[in-house]
Curated annotation (Swiss-Prot):
Superkingdom of this protein's organism: Eukaryota
UniProt-recorded name of the protein: Dermonecrotic toxin LapSicTox-alphaIB2
The keyword Transit peptide is assigned to this record: no
Reactions performed catalytically: an N-(acyl)-sphingosylphosphocholine = an N-(acyl)-sphingosyl-1,3-cyclic phosphate + choline; an N-(acyl)-sphingosylphosphoethanolamine = an N-(acyl)-sphingosyl-1,3-cyclic phosphate + ethanolamine; a 1-acyl-sn-glycero-3-phosphocholine = a 1-acyl-sn-glycero-2,3-cyclic phosphate + choline; a 1-acyl-sn-glycero-3-phosphoethanolamine = a 1-acyl-sn-glycero-2,3-cyclic phosphate + ethanolamine
GO biological-process terms attached to the record: killing of cells of another organism; lipid catabolic process
Purpose: Dermonecrotic toxins cleave the phosphodiester linkage between the phosphate and headgroup of certain phospholipids (sphingolipid and lysolipid substrates), forming an alcohol (often choline) and a cyclic phosphate. This toxin acts on sphingomyelin (SM). It may also act on ceramide phosphoethanolamine (CPE), lysophosphatidylcholine (LPC) and lysophosphatidylethanolamine (LPE), but not on lysophosphatidylserine (LPS), and lysophosphatidylglycerol (LPG). It acts by transphosphatidylation, releasing exclusively cyclic phosphate products as second products.
GO cellular component terms listed in the entry, alphabetical order: extracellular region
Comment on bound cofactor: Binds 1 Mg(2+) ion per subunit.
List of catalytic residues: H5, H41 (nucleophile)
Binding annotation for Mg(2+): E25, D27, D85
Organism of this sequence: Loxosceles apachea
Family statement: Belongs to the arthropod phospholipase D family. Class II subfamily.
Cofactor(s) for this UniProt protein: Mg(2+)
Amino acid sequence: WIMGHMVNANYQIDEFVNLGANSIETDVSFDSSANPEYTYHGVPCDCRRWCKKWEYFNNFLKALRKATTPGDSKYHEKLVLVVFDLKTGSLYDNQAYDAGKKLAKNLLQHYWNNGNNGGRAYIVLSIPNLAHYKLITGFKETLKTEGHPELMEKVGYDFSGNDDIGDVANAYKKAGVTGHVWQSDGITNCLLRGLDRVRKAVANRDSSNGYINKVYYWTVDKRQSTRDALDAGVDGIMTNYPDVIADVLNESAYKAKFRIASYDDNPWETFKN
């Protein structure tokens, strides 16, 4: 999965997919009542990026729905996964459940079209704080209450705080999550970060009793760091330059081993060689 980083304005969906991304990451900011309000990152953000592009969350969802609904004039067949980077740092811990509930209602109405031929992409809810695990509970219970528990088949999870892998496993236990787990590791492109924790996550993914299904690394903009991440065995790379990742995947060393994921590749299944 080539994951376009910080796609927060509607027009950037086309821009990143046209550069080679089959997945995008979008920042979601919340108001003081835990309503998802804007797709917005803000300052500081990655080097060589403009941090202030934004859209109202529901308007972004509508554009995303069009981009992932077969038959729509804006449809992109290869856009198959969306990571919502949930900026819950502005919320109190006790608002996490409400944030999940409100997020689910927004997605149900504006992305899934109330279960009636909505967008088809798989969705990852990426949460920066382990203490906010109840966001998952709120999301799940709301879809059930609203009569669409089947949509949870399209939803996965990520805790993005680079926490100890054992602590992450524990948070999932509390949230009642037993699958659909993506594990992120990384740092802004302005700084360097080694691959030690990525290797631990990959080892967990590949062990018989691990909780992780997929591992992705962020934010990778250079050819050499792309090669290093692929060599470490990641499933996804988040980038500001999808074309760079696509180029490396075309190199002879990687062409035979990796391919770009399509809609038929289940993002919740651990890949077995």
